[in-house]
Amino acid sequence: MTLLKTPLLDTIRDAADVRRLPQDKLAQLAAELRAETIDAVSVTGGHLGAGLGVVELTVALHHVFNTPHDRLIWDVGHQCYPHKILTGRRDRIRTLRQGGGLSGFTRRAESEYDPFGAAHSSTSISAGLGMAVARDLSGEERNVVCVIGDGAMSAGMAYEAMNNAGAMDSRLIVILNDNDMSIAPPTGAMSAYLARLISGQTYRSLREIGKQIAGHLPKFVERGAARAEEFARGFWTGGTLFEELGFYYVGPIDGHNLDHLLPVLKNVRDAKTGPILVHVVTQKGKGYAPAEASADKYHGVVKFDVVTGAQVKAKSNAPSYTRVFAESLISQARHDPKVVAITAAMPSGTGLDLFGQVYPERTFDVGIAEQHAVTFAAGLAAEGFKPFCALYSTFLQRAYDQVVHDVALQGLPVRFIIDRAGLVGADGATHAGAFDIAFLACLPGMTVMAPADEAELVHMMATMVAFDDGPSAVRFPRGEGVGVERPERGEVLPIGKGRIVHGTGEGDIALLSLGTRLAACLDAAERLEAAGFTVTVADARFAKPLDRELVLKLAAGHGALVTVEEGSVGGFGSHVLQLVTDEGLLDRGAVKVRAMVLPDIYIDQETQARQLAAAGLDADAIVAKVEGLLGKAKAGVSLHKAG
């Protein structure tokens, strides 16, 4: 870690200290804040580029607005590291995304300066509008400021909220952090002058006087005058879209120029009417050359060398499940021109950047628009194509109605690739994929698979391409596989059939695993057998349709049956329990059945291994579960590993 010299930042305990600084000191504070952010993320890893892009904006907002009394909401949330440093959390900033440390996103439980938790995009304007209305109903005085950017304006929810806010005429301030200049670039001094002019009280007062005068004119003249004024401002500023939604538009402004930012923010702070949208143009990675040169690579980083920018990546023992999926899909697409791929603004995260390099015309990135992605895939499936819709488990939640109504109800063969299923490590509870088994396996006609290793994923990809009888899904975790050899071409698996991978199918205990918990089951089985138990281990492969024959065989042939899955209650284990109760096996006391699932809590950031241990889903927990069912070891051997 570099020994930084940050004399001005060292005087900042919270945002009140930022407000006490004279304006001519803010540029120095921003420079020191940027250096501190770079150094901290080099130690912990995390989201770097977005935070560097809003350093000046963060300083300006805390200087102008009376936070935390004024509500400041960040969206997506991962650009909040500079905000955390200025709001009393600098002493813990090098615990970002670590067990027991600061969250990588805003979090209500962490600080009063985080009025709303945000890790999924495009929620800020809706939440901010709710806070603004609550303020008005309570007769309070405060500003509500929503900072939205980093692609979040590609999601429909943001426009739904803006439409509502405009119709309600609520006093709400939205800062559009445009960090790819997708709408309009700032044009130097003229742009800054216009932004300052039209955000000021004089212009807004004259505008209101003009409206009152126009109100006494014939309606067609009044409408014409309003359109002319809107056109004139829209011509110079490019904000017509936001004006049509009912927002007063200001900008674009250079988001790295404090002399431009501060007067505009003061003007909108003091405005008595709203809503107002301030369009700020920033650069991701600003002030750190490697991040400026490669915004995509430095969006999210592991630990890195500050001087060179080189990221310290651990050597892989096996390919990631994401890569195995992508390479398998490419292989399948060579033989089937109907295979197409869809992602919602996550091409590199889902591996579809690799597919897109080979088949760009068959790859579709629809933006942060999961609802649209699913129904878009449904339309492709309706016309005979084979769409693979690749989403993180946590983001698939945003499109559940489309999964049910547009896909499952119509029996359309959309293939869902569910990445980051289960616990995800440093991104914590907001990005965990705990619920997909439960909310998919309950749907009629849905097929849900989970591979135990890389080879199984290759086979499941072949199965999905061949399966046209309805929607299907495969879920796999973040991170590397277990290192097994992958077949060149996958085999089509029989739908709804599992396999016994260890044992005879009869004995004291049967462990029935869904997905990658199979390795922990095999580890537990080895220790249980050393202690004198006879153990069968089976890989279910499918949560739905359930392999009834396999489940009933295991239940009939063992004194106890334990299911293991990296998912919430209501998933695979619940379906197994439903079957054995329907068959009356529990009535007769023929078998003891237990389901091992994620606990009914949100599990905070940690390493994945520690999260699994805390969740009670590692080999130690499986052994303990069997010990509780069947008693101590038969052979007098310890069931637990030494050390």
Curated annotation (Swiss-Prot):
Record-listed thiamine diphosphate binding positions: 78, 119-121, 151-152, 179, 288, 370
Classification via SMART domains: Transket_pyr (SM00861)
Listed InterPro entries: Dxylulose-5-P_synthase (IPR005477), THDP-binding (IPR029061), Transketo_C/PFOR_II (IPR009014), Transketolase-like_Pyr-bd (IPR005475), Transketolase_BS (IPR020826), Transketolase_C (IPR033248), Transketolase_CS (IPR049557)
EC number: 2.2.1.7
Highest taxon in the source lineage: Bacteria
Free-text cofactor note: Binds 1 Mg(2+) ion per subunit. Binds 1 thiamine pyrophosphate per subunit.
Pathway where it operates: Metabolic intermediate biosynthesis; 1-deoxy-D-xylulose 5-phosphate biosynthesis; 1-deoxy-D-xylulose 5-phosphate from D-glyceraldehyde 3-phosphate and pyruvate: step 1/1
Residue sites binding Mg(2+) per the record: 150, 179
GO MF annotation terms: 1-deoxy-D-xylulose-5-phosphate synthase activity; magnesium ion binding; thiamine pyrophosphate binding
Reaction equation(s) it catalyzes: D-glyceraldehyde 3-phosphate + pyruvate + H(+) = 1-deoxy-D-xylulose 5-phosphate + CO2
Keywords: Isoprene biosynthesis, Magnesium, Metal-binding, Thiamine biosynthesis, Thiamine pyrophosphate, Transferase
Cofactor list: Mg(2+); thiamine diphosphate
CDD domains: TPP_DXS, TPP_PYR_DXS_TK_like
Enzyme class: transferase
GO biological process: 1-deoxy-D-xylulose 5-phosphate biosynthetic process; glyceraldehyde-3-phosphate metabolic process; terpenoid biosynthetic process; thiamine biosynthetic process
Oligomer and partners: Homodimer.
Function: Catalyzes the acyloin condensation reaction between C atoms 2 and 3 of pyruvate and glyceraldehyde 3-phosphate to yield 1-deoxy-D-xylulose-5-phosphate (DXP).
Similarity section: Belongs to the transketolase family. DXPS subfamily.
PANTHER family xrefs: 1-D-DEOXYXYLULOSE 5-PHOSPHATE SYNTHASE-RELATED, 1-DEOXY-D-XYLULOSE-5-PHOSPHATE SYNTHASE, CHLOROPLASTIC
Official protein name in the record: 1-deoxy-D-xylulose-5-phosphate synthase
Organism: Xanthobacter autotrophicus (strain ATCC BAA-1158 / Py2)
